[in-house]
Amino acid sequence: MNHYLFSESLMEQLKTLSTSWSLPVAAVVAAIGIFATMGLFSSKNHMPVEGRTVLLTGASEGMGRSAAIQLSQKGANVILVSRNVGRLEEALVDVRAAAKNPSTQRFTYISADVSEHDYAAAVLAEAIAWNGGRSPDIVWCVAGMSTPLLWTDDGSMAAARRNMDVNYFGSAEMSRAILREWLAPENSTGPNGEPKHLVFTASMLALFAILGYGPYTPTKWALRGLADTLAMEVNYYPDNPVKVHIVYPGTIVSPGYERENQTKPDITVELEKDEPAESPDTVARRAIAGLEAGKYFVDVSFLGRLMQCGIMGGSPRNNWVLDTLMGWLIPIIYFFVLRGMNSTIVKWAREKGHPFTHPKKK
């Protein structure tokens, strides 16, 4: 079975649970997880990449760079998109060195700012020209940023607009541009054609909000709403098969994480201190495994899997039976988690004084 939960020890995954999650309930969830391994997931690779062309935004560092390298190892042709040409050139060297078939695979980069209006049309035009007149087979929107601040802090609204431009509109513009290519009548392949894949990158904060991420969290909720909408909308074009996916990473040890810590309120650090931080390579590997398993909701940790099931609403399910069972249980867990977090917040405020008096990070 091509999914990390089944290839890695379940106990290792359980170790990543926050101490706020009770062990008895985690044991019940583990039992459900074991049930899930009993033939409920297909072993088919639903997103083969060998010989296909993948375009990734945010590919010069962090998770995007790691994903590009691992896709190269699987035989993909890769187009890297990011702003910084120097980092793109460095990443391109690593991606090319990882090639499964060096004599046939092709690689390039395109410098672009995803926050700029209508950037995607020019990027795709360049990508299509480089790819012999063919659009990329897979587009993965990874580019993102986070500026944690209290909502009452100076600069929070400017940060919110900037986060929305990068995280939401950067992905929204790319998704619209590529879907106009893939779904055009002249590109119809019939319902049995090899599907294209559009991959969004959200965050576990789109499943469970935490104090201090006001400028950031709404951008990922918006992205989830767009992904849910497009997952339904592509069915309106049955002769142009497209699969939509959305990945939910947690904390990734990356340059972006270092930048977000420069403004992160101390109380936010306290609330998320038990959340494990993963390497970009680990997160990319698990995300790719989820995509290959055909998942719409792509989790990259056991905790993320639990959180998804507790807040799926009308989103497409990976597995109706398992997700429904876990969806009954997770709200009970949330009752205790939220009570613990809110208790910490109140205690912190009483000990530290009024938040307006706290020293601000520069």
Swiss-Prot record:
GO terms for cellular component: endoplasmic reticulum membrane. NADP(+) binds at L55, N84, D113, R176, Y216, K220, I252, S254. Keywords: Endoplasmic reticulum, Lipid metabolism, Membrane, NADP, Nucleotide-binding, Oxidoreductase, Sphingolipid metabolism, Transmembrane, Transmembrane helix. The keyword Nucleotide-binding applies. Pathway: Lipid metabolism; sphingolipid metabolism. Pfam families: adh_short. It is a single-pass membrane protein. It is found in: Endoplasmic reticulum membrane. GO terms for molecular function: 3-dehydrosphinganine reductase activity; NADPH binding. InterPro entries: KDSR-like, NAD(P)-bd_dom_sf, SDR_fam. It catalyses: sphinganine + NADP(+) = 3-oxosphinganine + NADPH + H(+). One of its GO terms (biological process) is 3-keto-sphinganine metabolic process. The keyword Nucleotide-binding applies. It comes from the Eukaryota. NADPH binds at G58, S60, G62, R83, R87, D113. Its main location: endoplasmic reticulum. The active site is at Y216 (proton acceptor), K220 (lowers pka of active site tyr). A motif (GXSXG) lies at residues 58-62. Its EC number is 1.1.1.102. The chain crosses the membrane at residues 318-338. Catalyzes the reduction of 3'-oxosphinganine (3-ketodihydrosphingosine/KDS) to sphinganine (dihydrosphingosine/DHS), the second step of de novo sphingolipid biosynthesis. Belongs to the short-chain dehydrogenases/reductases (SDR) family. This is 3-ketodihydrosphingosine reductase gsl-3. It comes from Neurospora crassa (strain ATCC 24698 / 74-OR23-1A / CBS 708.71 / DSM 1257 / FGSC 987). The lineage of its organism: Eukaryota, Fungi, Dikarya, Ascomycota, Pezizomycotina. The gene is gsl-3.
